[in-house]
């Protein structure tokens, strides 16, 4: 809430106008109760002797989500022996600074997971989140169809993992609607990420306000190279390729340190079936 107040002071716009429409019952009972969001979700596959991490491709027909294609995509992932899992980075809201991640390397490394769900529902939600993060031509119709499909899938998929990924979809949907000024005509169950709202309010770094404010509020240099070690050398030696679409949600993948730890995760961390397993 304090970040919301700071944003209101910077922009001169009351807090209420920044908040998306929510129903009181949904606001009182959020999908996931903590300010942590799953980010940088990529599908990881093994191809010959290489690992490939790539975004879920956009599946659309007449501007809407192609549900039949999505079902087949999920089935193929669950049945493929070459599918390794999804990369998932767990970030607290204020740590996601749009173009920077406000975490030291040793902490960020622990936040990167390789999730290999066995449930079709969780797999589908991960695909939808990856698709949402990497969608370059966002439209109200497509955004609405993603959130509607995700909610239906979440309703029949119990567990904390489904709730957590659904929270990410709700949050990024609200954020995309705010950033791109899309009229989705729906009640969101999460609020836009505050740092993304601040990024939009401040404006481009070439403007006087952006040039002054962005280094203060939206830059962090914690995630920098700390020197090469044996894991780094092994990461460079093993072929791991990362593919993604350039959107406001994937700016972190331009950071070499982020890429390094994602690759290390795919190489050295065993896949887990749940982010909440003990």
Curated annotation (Swiss-Prot):
Its main location: virion. It is found in: Virion; Virion tegument; Host cytoplasm; Host Golgi apparatus. InterPro entries: Herpes_UL7 (IPR002600). GO terms for cellular component: host cell Golgi apparatus; viral tegument. Coiled coil: none annotated. It comes from the Viruses. Keywords: Host cytoplasm, Host Golgi apparatus, Virion, Virion tegument. It holds the Pfam family Herpes_UL7. Plays a critical role in cytoplasmic virus egress. Participates in the final step of tegumentation and envelope acquisition within the host cytoplasm. Belongs to the herpesviridae cytoplasmic envelopment protein 1 family. This is Cytoplasmic envelopment protein 1. It comes from Human herpesvirus 8 type P (isolate GK18) (HHV-8). The gene is ORF42.
């Amino acid at each position: 809430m304090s970040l919301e107040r700071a944003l209101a002071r910077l922009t001169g716009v009351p807090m209420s106008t920044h908040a998306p429409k929510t129903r009181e019952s949904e606001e009182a009972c959020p999908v996931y109760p903590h300010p942590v969001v799953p980010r940088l979700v990529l599908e990881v596959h093994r191809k010959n002797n290489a690992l490939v991490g790539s975004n879920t491709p956009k599946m659309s027909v007449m501007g809407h989500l192609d549900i039949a294609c999505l079902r087949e995509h999920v089935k193929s992932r669950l049945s493929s022996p070459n599918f390794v899992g999804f990369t998932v980075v767990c970030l607290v809201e204020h740590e996601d600074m749009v173009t920077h991640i406000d975490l030291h390397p040793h902490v960020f490394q622990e936040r990167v997971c390789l999730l290999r769900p066995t449930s079709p529902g969780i797999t589908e939600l991960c695909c939808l989140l990856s698709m949402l993060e990497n969608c370059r031509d966002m439209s109200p119709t497509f955004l609405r169809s993603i959130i509607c499909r995700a909610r239906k899938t979440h309703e029949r998929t119990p567990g904390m993992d489904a709730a957590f990924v659904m929270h990410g979809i709700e949050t990024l949907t609200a954020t995309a609607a705010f950033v791109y000024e899309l009229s989705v005509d729906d009640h969101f169950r999460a609020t836009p990420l505050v740092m993304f709202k601040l990024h939009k309010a401040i404006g481009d770094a070439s403007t006087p306000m952006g040039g002054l404010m962005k280094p203060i509020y939206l830059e962090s240099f914690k995630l920098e190279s700390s020197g090469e070690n044996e894991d780094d050398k092994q990461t460079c030696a093993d072929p791991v390729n990362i593919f993604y679409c350039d959107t406001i949600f994937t700016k972190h993948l331009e950071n070499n340190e982020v890429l390094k730890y994602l690759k290390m995760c795919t190489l050295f961390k065993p896949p887990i079936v749940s982010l909440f397993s003990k």
